[in-house]
Structure formats: structure tokens, C-alpha cells
């Protein structure tokens, strides 16, 4: 059985799909929290946020922003909630990453509130350290990959410049 988003892609119905390209889909689903709710999701099946490649995630975010502006203008919304339910613990119902843009109006009866909990100082510090250490490990890998990519781009750039210089020099040599 396919996921709901993959079925939308497969059906390719125009009333459901607002926008699509080779990487991302913007669609209205059958069951929504509010009239005009729109979902932005990658065409390729990625279950959670952490699985989505950065360039696709960036495109999803840009489209979610544009859809939000269209909801404000087209539906005269007074606000929007932009929601990502990431994983079972976050009550993700569809096993496919998506960004929900929910139009809001004052007094619409939609309750997305939760009770904040006060953390103890030691809990806060332990949480901060654990997240920072994990992030630093990931950043070291990311920075290494970025540096390697920059080196490759630099080498390509030098070759292109060299090729261009040779072309210009050859052209100049032909002048009488």
C-alpha cells in the first residue's frame, strides 16, 4: 500500500495538485484541518525531515512561503500555521515528509496549543550539552564535505579559466 502523498503523485489530478515539478509537489488533500490547507512535499518518498536532501528541503521551504502568501491573498486568511509533523512521536500520520500550511482566522476553533513545561536547570544544561555535541559532530562532517566540494569547484574553475584564457590567446594570435 502506498502512502497518501505517493498516491496523489500517481493520480496526478489537477484539482488536487496546485504545482509540481521534477522534485516537489504542492497539493490540497481530501482531509484537512481547515479549508484551504495546502501540503508541500517532495516527489521522491522521504519519510522524515532528516531524510530529505538539503536542496529539496530548501525548495519545499521556499514553496511553503509562497503558498502562505497566496493563502493570505487568495483566501483572506488572518494567519497561517506552518506545521511539520516529523515522526510517530510528533503524530505524523502520513509516512512521507510534508509541510502543512493551514489558513487561520480569529475564532476558527482550531486548537494547536500545548502546555509548556518548565525545565529544571540541570535538565536544561544536560539537554543543551547533548544537542550541542551531536550538532558539532554533524557539523564537522558537513564542514569537511563543504571544504572538499570547494576544492573541486576551485579546480574546475581554474581549468575553465585556463581554457578560456587559451581560447582568448588563440583568438589574439589569429589577429593580423
Question: What are these language model-derived features?
Answer:
Residues 1-176:
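HIT superfamily nucleotide-processing domains
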Amino acid at each position: 500500500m502506498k502512502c497518501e502523498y505517493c498516491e496523489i503523485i500517481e493520480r496526478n489530478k489537477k484539482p488536487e495538485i496546485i504545482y509540481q515539478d521534477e522534485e516537489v509537489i504542492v497539493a490540497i488533500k481530501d482531509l484537512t484541518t481547515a479549508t484551504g490547507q495546502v501540503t508541500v512535499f517532495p516527489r521522491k518518498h522521504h519519510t522524515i525531515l532528516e531524510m530529505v536532501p538539503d536542496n529539496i528541503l530548501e525548495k519545499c521551504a521556499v514553496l511553503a512561503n509562497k503558498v502562505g502568501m497566496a493563502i493570505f491573498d487568495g483566501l483572506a486568511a488572518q494567519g497561517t500555521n506552518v506545521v511539520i509533523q516529523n515522526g510517530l512521536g510528533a503524530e505524523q500520520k502520513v509516512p512521507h515528509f510534508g509541510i502543512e500550511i493551514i489558513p487561520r482566522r480569529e475564532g476558527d476553533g482550531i486548537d494547536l496549543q500545548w502546555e509548556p513545561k518548565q525545565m529544571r536547570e540541570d535538565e536544561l544544561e544536560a539537554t543543551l550539552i547533548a544537542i550541542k555535541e551531536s550538532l558539532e559532530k554533524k557539523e564537522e562532517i558537513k564542514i569537511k564535505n563543504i571544504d572538499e566540494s570547494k576544492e573541486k569547484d576551485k579546480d574546475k574553475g581554474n581549468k575553465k579559466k585556463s581554457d578560456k584564457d587559451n581560447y582568448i590567446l588563440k583568438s589574439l594570435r589569429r589577429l593580423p
